[in-house]
A protein has these predicted regions:
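Accessory RNA 3′-end/elbow-binding domains used by RNA modification enzymes
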Residues: 1-12, 16-33, 37, 41-42, ...
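Catalytic cores of RNA-modifying enzymes
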Residues: 1-167, 174-206
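A short local loop/turn or secondary-structure capping micro-motif enriched for an aromatic residue
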Residues: 136, 169, 290-293
Length: 301
């Protein structure tokens, strides 16, 4: 089996749990995912099967989109309501003040990763230290918030929901805590749903229960498998001849001027997706010294 199953991960399952369950259902041993979702989070989790697992280390940097629910007035050890309350605050937050605060978090910002995260400091995972009650200094990291919209807000309950499109490595829990601080209070994430990642949306996703039902009914999973090239749809597509395709699959370089590449600037290091006759996906190549150099193929020779 080869391709991508876009899972709508259920709450209270780790990403590893999801991989293990799908491995059991599909009998495909080679399965990986494109980015961890916390157990409390739900939503888009692309799972790579078979040869598609080779794409994990090659994924382009793409934004991810979330809907995040929050509540002001309580701070938690974990930054979300799965932890223990460590501080309360009754400061009111008006919608107008919240909207103004959000302006400070759009675009390029610096964010300190939370203690309850998989980030390593001096070779130790932060979450392991946090579980021992140890807090260490962490360096702020640059992240990009492309979209930040207040979808809902109840001033009396101090609860609401945000739409967030952000770069890889952004912690939504921390974003909410920082927004609360900007509003002069404390806050925490109460729910998180990833609505888009790696070019996929919830419209592409299937539930675990659906996969289980398909297995029980003897249905093929082929109809829900997405092609691996979907992961690279944001790259420039280059068409090559069958002879060039064979040279590429053997590890050879291709002269850019002899390929049917779009007439656009191709800076050194640009990664492209190669297709035989514009249809069959071959793999990835990199522009270097007037040639497309082999990076990784996803096609049999």
């Amino acid at each position: 089996m080869e391709g991508i199953i876009v899972l709508d991960k259920p709450q209270d399952f780790t990403s590893f749990d999801a991989v293990a369950i799908v491995r059991g259902l599909t009998r495909e041993r080679r399965i990986g995912h494109t980015g961890t979702l916390d157990p409390m989070a739900t939503g888009v989790l692309p799972l790579l099967l078979g040869r598609a697992t080779k794409a994990v280390s090659l994924l382009p940097e793409t934004a991810k989109t979330y809907e995040a629910s929050f509540r002001f007035g309580e701070a938690y050890t974990t930054g979300d309501v799965t932890g223990e309350v460590i501080k309360t605050d009754e400061t009111p937050v008006l919608r107008a003040a919240l909207e103004t605060a959000l302006d400070s978090f759009r675009g390029d910002i610096l964010q300190v990763p939370p203690m309850y995260s998989a980030v390593s400091v001096n070779g130790q995972r932060l979450y392991k230290l946090a579980r021992q009650g140890i807090e260490v200094e962490r360096e702020a990291r640059p992240v990009h918030i492309a979209e930040l919209t207040l979808l809902e807000y109840n001033e009396n309950e101090k609860t609401g929901k945000l739409h967030v499109t952000c770069s890889k490595g952004t912690y939504i829990r921390t974003l909410i805590e920082d927004i609360a601080q900007k509003c002069g209070t404390v806050g925490a994430m109460t729910a998180l749903r990833r609505t888009a990642a790696c070019g996929f949306t919830l419209a592409d996703a299937v539930l675990l229960d659906t996969l289980k039902a398909m297995k029980e009914n003897g249905e093929s999973f082929d109809e829900i498998l997405r092609p691996v090239e979907k992961l690279f749809s944001m790259l420039t597509a280059v068409s090559v001849t069958p002879a060039q395709a064979q040279r590429y699959l053997n590890g050879g370089a291709l002269t850019i001027s002899r390929c049917r590449a779009p007439k656009i600037a191709m800076p050194e290091g640009t990664q492209v997706a190669l297709y035989e006759d514009g249809e069959k996906f071959l793999g990835l190549a990199r522009a270097e010294n007037g040639e497309f150099k082999y990076v990784k193929s996803f096609s049999e020779k």
